[in-house]
Amino acid sequence: MGTVHARSLEPLPSSGTDFGALGEEAEFVEVEPEAKQEILENKDVVVQHVHFDGLGRTKDDIIICEIGEVFKAKNLIEVMRRSHEAREKLLRLGIFRQVDVLIDTCHGEDALPNGLDVTFEVTELRRLTGSYNTMVGNNEGSMVLGLKLPNLLGRAEKVTFQFSYGTKETSYGLSFFKPQPGNFERNFSVNLYKVTGQFPWSSLRETDRGVSAEYSFPLWKTSHTVKWEGVWRELGCLSRTASFAVRKESGHSLKSSLSHAMVIDSRNSSILPRRGALFKVNQELAGYTGGDVSFIKEDFELQLNKPLALDSVFSTSLWGGMLVPIGDKPSSIADRFYLGGPTSVRGFSMHSIGPQSEGDYLGGEAYWAGGLHLYTPLPFRPGQGGFGELFRTHFFLNAGNLCNLNYGEGPKAHIRKLAECIRWSYGAGVVLRLGNIARLELNYCIPMGVQGGDRICDGVQFGAGIRFL
């Protein structure tokens, strides 16, 4: 009887019977006789059985939820497409090292003339895995060591221990992750961690020891995360020359907060998008679940990307946020917003805009920042179609402001203060995209609207990170 083998299926064509688009990894062998081929290609088929080879500690219910759509396929192309989608879902669980798909005509006494069997050949991950890699944060690099216990209880649970040593931050943490069967985006996690960070722009050292629990879920076209966090914070001076304003912030505090984040992301890439939009909103309420820190904090991020002629992209972004202390106690330097640097308002030093004391930047309780960008291919297109596609020429205009507000005044007074003393800059440079990990920028910046106390970077400025204004 005719058989069809399809292993590691690549994305399939949206319609038609052009099997040549499947790539090298999909093969068709022994398709005979022609009458059977006609049945498979041009008539309805029925998926009678789905088999799994290679399962060990994985429970049946977690995988049944991922392959249910395969049974709904009505023709061969749809069977292959849905099998490929099921394969991607199985790999996304993070419990298999390899998943291959075999599609064959059905055998046995109950076999229908147009019946098919689909077999998933899987290789489970080992019970304990380790990793070593480097990560790029916002103008910071770090080395990361990790140990992971995948599929701990057989339903895609995961326990992870991670140690990170960076240029400004050292951390280690233990986390437990549990997805909902059949809906990987709906998951629950618990984290224990300790983070020690150095913030030279504020002459501040901070050590956080905490626990958090969060629940993530999709809702229509949005993604939501609800989180509780309890953290013991220890603030200290980074140097003997720290200002008095920083010294009086030193000591211990306990923060217990509830937060919510909503994300709508239609971009084709999070690092250097060519099209799509991002809208992100975060809310945090501290003090009502314990601790000695009380505030309401809100911030948002908006980004729009539009492709233009000649392989160019126009991008615009807007950030903003506000922190309102609750009660008579002022806000902490650890909770305020910071602005400036190669990843936000370019042309200014890292976090060196706004309120400061004796050269130490104290952050602000309200801010906004916006940017206009034009990304074009490199002149004369060197390396076109290859390595040169990772580079883009970059023209930008940034602006923003960071300040403290008098909450006894009305909204008009707040807007007026945020509109005063606007810092802005413009320039041009080159952007390098490092896959989907990070991006590097080398820009020539001309800062404008500089205020007293601001620290500028007039000329060439280098930036590395994953989130840019």
Swiss-Prot record:
Its main location: mitochondrion. Its C-terminal part seems to contain many membrane-spanning sided beta-sheets, that have the potential to adopt a transmembrane beta-barrel type structure. GO terms for cellular component: mitochondrial inner membrane; mitochondrion; SAM complex. This is Sorting and assembly machinery component 50 homolog. It is a multi-pass membrane protein. Residues 45-125 form the POTRA domain. PROSITE patterns: POTRA (PS51779). GO terms for biological process: cristae formation; protein insertion into mitochondrial outer membrane. The keyword Transport does not apply. The gene is Samm50.
